[in-house]
């Protein structure tokens, strides 16, 4: 908690996202942040009403999800945000390997109320899309990955 307080106190961008969002007239705004708790991510979490967490079915992701959930809960409990975790969605799923099943089992054990049933498969077309400057759903809308989203 102390590290979180120091990071927030020293955050030069704190509040910029919330101010920018107030000027928009949308029902939903999605903020895609990096998978790290840097100052931009913290500002996005504070500015958000809710969080949808995409999670790769890998063990490092399991370690990160616990930290992220704890951070969101600390921010909410300290009164800095009303952010609610909407859920966790598994991405880059490869049903051919045991790791996906093992990670899914752990997610079901530790986060049963947050876990969506939807599985986004590992798909090369989704991975190629950014190299063409497009979202995966626009690059190849008929691919299995795009359809899953």
Predicted stretch roles:
Residues 128-148:
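C-terminal boundary of histidine-terminating zinc-finger modules
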Residues 10-14, 58-61, 142:
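Flexible, glycine- and charge-enriched loops at secondary-structure boundaries
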Residues 22-24, 28-124:
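Conserved catalytic-core segment of NTP-binding enzymes
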Residues 1-27, 129-132:
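P-loop/Walker-type NTP enzyme "switch/lid" segment
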Residues 13, 17, 103, 115-116, ...:
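Hydrophobic side chains within well-formed alpha-helices
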Residues 2-9, 98, 137-141:
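Acidic, proline/glycine-rich intrinsically disordered inter-domain spacer in sigma factors
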Residues 16, 67, 148:
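Charged catalytic carboxylate motif
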């Amino acid at each position: 908690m102390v590290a979180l307080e120091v990071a927030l106190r020293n955050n030069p961008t704190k509040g910029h996202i919330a101010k920018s969002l107030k000027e928009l007239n949308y029902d939903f705004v999605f903020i895609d942040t990096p998978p790290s708790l840097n100052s931009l991510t913290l500002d996005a979490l504070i500015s958000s009403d809710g969080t949808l967490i995409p999670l790769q079915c890998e063990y490092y992701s399991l370690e990160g999800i616990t930290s992220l959930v704890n951070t969101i809960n600390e921010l909410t409990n300290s009164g800095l945000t009303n952010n609610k975790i909407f859920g966790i969605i598994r991405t880059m799923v490869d049903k051919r390997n045991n790791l996906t099943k093992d990670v899914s089992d752990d997610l079901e054990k530790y986060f049963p109320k947050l876990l969506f049933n939807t599985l986004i498969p590992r798909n090369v077309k989704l991975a190629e899309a950014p190299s063409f400057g497009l979202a995966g759903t626009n690059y190849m809308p008929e691919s299995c990955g795009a359809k899953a989203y």
